[in-house]
Curated annotation (Swiss-Prot):
Belongs to the universal ribosomal protein uL24 family. One of its GO terms (cellular component) is ribonucleoprotein complex. Gene3D superfamilies: 2.30.30.30. GO terms for molecular function: rRNA binding; structural constituent of ribosome. This is Large ribosomal subunit protein uL24. HAMAP family: Ribosomal_uL24_B. GO terms for biological process: translation. It comes from the Bacteria. Part of the 50S ribosomal subunit. Pfam families: KOW, ribosomal_L24. The keyword DNA repair does not apply. Coiled coil: none annotated. Keywords: Ribonucleoprotein, Ribosomal protein, RNA-binding, rRNA-binding.
Length: 104
């Protein structure tokens, strides 16, 4: 099945502690999850690695969030939208369900 949410898409969080926040997708994992910039931040306790000159401490980083909790953001309508597919010039393209506009 084709991916409805891809890397570099702007998405909005539908549920959870970050509900309503927007961010750019950094990575989509094969487990049906995505990592979004600035969303679902966790604190990781990291040990120092002297060989790589890396200090230890508490590091904030993005955790994966399930794709079902994300919706693609339609900038033209300024709201969350669903994704559909359409064949254009023999190629399958993603479109917004609300207005039929092609997603870049």
């Amino acid at each position: 099945m084709a991916a409805k949410i891809r890397r570099d898409d702007e998405v909005i969080v539908l549920t959870g502690k970050d509900k309503g926040k927007r961010g750019k997708v950094k990575n989509v994992l094969s487990s049906g999850k995505a990592i979004v910039e600035g969303i679902n931040l966790i604190k990781k306790h990291q040990k120092p690695v002297p060989a790589m000159n890396q200090p230890g401490g508490i590091v904030e980083k993005e955790a994966a969030i399930d794709l079902s909790n994300l919706a693609i953001f339609n900038a033209a309508a300024s709201k969350a939208d669903r994704v559909g597919f359409k064949i254009e010039d023999g190629k399958k393209v993603r479109v917004f369900k609300s207005n039929g506009e092609t997603i870049k």
